[in-house]
Amino acid sequence: MEPEIISRESIKPSSATPLHLKTHKLCLLDQYRHHAYFPIVLYYPFNQEPNISDPTQINHIVSERLQLLKQSLPETLSRFYPFAGKIKDNLSVDCNDEGIYFVEARVKSSLSDYFNQPNFANANYKFIPFDVKELSGSISGLHVAKIQVTTFAYGGLVICACLSHLFGDGITLNSFLKSWVATACKNAEEAERPNNDASSLFPQQEIYPKEATWTEMCKPFYRDGRFVSRRFLFDAKAIANLKDKVASSLVQNPSRVEAVSALLSRCIMTAFKGKFGSHRPILLTHTVNMRRKAKPLMPEYSMGNIVWTANALCTNEEPELDGLVGKLREAIMEINGDFLKSLQGDEGFLNLCEAAKNESALCSSAVERITFSSWCNFGLVDIDFGWGKPIWVSTIGIDGPVPCFSNTIILMDTRLKGEIEAWVYLLEEDMNILELDKELIAFAKMDPSPM
């Protein structure tokens, strides 16, 4: 089921970027991050036209949909002009209007055939428009964003949008997708324009110390070996039961994200105990969207890496679920409006270095790190270009000795309200233990088909 590349091109904005906007300065929070393309993948079946079975008609409709995607990009890029540019260096993006990198690919089998494969999720790397080589080496001249649209026999379609983490976070890419949808559906006037104030709120540092970067923080937790990803689906009923189980006097009404995070943390920590023979200090981290912490609130369409990591250190004791929820809630609450304000203005760099120093100290106290990133409530399952919502939304699966630091979990919504699909990335030997965890199996289904 190898995709055939039909075309590669650059799609340019419909209007030229003004001269005073040609250079987009990265903000201080962007400098803390690093370049790596992260993908959002949307899967659309051809079930909106149930009475059509003629291949010629199906191909015509799919061709129209593909053209709609391409023709609505230029106007979208005029608003999100850095997406059509290239990375200049660690300080700026050259908004040169060269265009967003766009790949069209085709698969001869159906989308249903893809979902019927064993471990299909670990084969979706075929839908991404970048090479692993672009994750290392020089970043100068790399596209800020890339898109691949893959069409399938009988009308299925997959859209993969990728963004460099040096430029922005998941909210940034999500905002672009929503604006693209508004343009495609002829509602461009209703689309909110991106807010590019981050570089003035969080002024960059021309000489930025390498030790104060997220990459350096994570170095102690990079592992060599074979990595695998598995998906664990928690349906609404299981989450309701789990929330009842983890509730306590400290956190009386835990969120579904907190409840699922606590369970996965304990199960992974139990897997480590089975591997090493005893509990070891573990650092639990959760990425926090700081736009909602600002006073006043920052616009949700604020571009950049407006996120920080909440850290909770778990020592050698046997972890209880309610205790883990309490630790996570306390850590997340520390990423508040005052913390965000401390990173702004002339004192922002010194305060960021102090925060990075504190995080580094926590990292040195832990033997392993479990990293959570929640994409829940992004609205990705509602991305409708005019032919219906996606049947599934995913990130990228892995299976092999790929560059990765282990123990990473991405939490995502499904098309059914209240569910969470957790993408878990571990060393294969750790995953083999986790898959057998009876407590996890009681609440979650592993690797279900979205069909």
Curated annotation (Swiss-Prot):
Coiled coil: none annotated. One of its GO terms (molecular function) is oxidoreductase activity. It catalyses: epi-neemfruitin B + acetyl-CoA = 7-acetyl-epi-neemfruitin B + CoA. Pathway: Secondary metabolite biosynthesis; terpenoid biosynthesis. Belongs to the plant acyltransferase family. Mainly expressed in petioles and, to a lower extent, in roots. Monomer. PANTHER family: F21J9.9, STEMMADENINE O-ACETYLTRANSFERASE-LIKE. It comes from Melia azedarach (Chinaberry tree). It holds the Pfam family Transferase. This is Epi-neemfruitin B 7-O-acetyltransferse L7AT. Acetyltransferase involved in the biosynthesis of limonoids triterpene natural products such as azadirachtin, an antifeedant widely used as bioinsecticide, and possessing many medicinal applications including anti-tumoral, anti-malarial, anti-rheumatic, antibacterial, anti-inflammatory, anti-pyretic and diuretic effects. Catalyzes the formation of 7-acetyl-epi-neemfruitin B from epi-neemfruitin B. It comes from the Eukaryota. Gene3D superfamilies: Chloramphenicol acetyltransferase-like domain. Its EC number is 2.1.1.-. The active site is at H165 (proton acceptor), D384 (proton acceptor). InterPro entries: CAT-like_dom_sf. Keywords: Acyltransferase, Transferase.
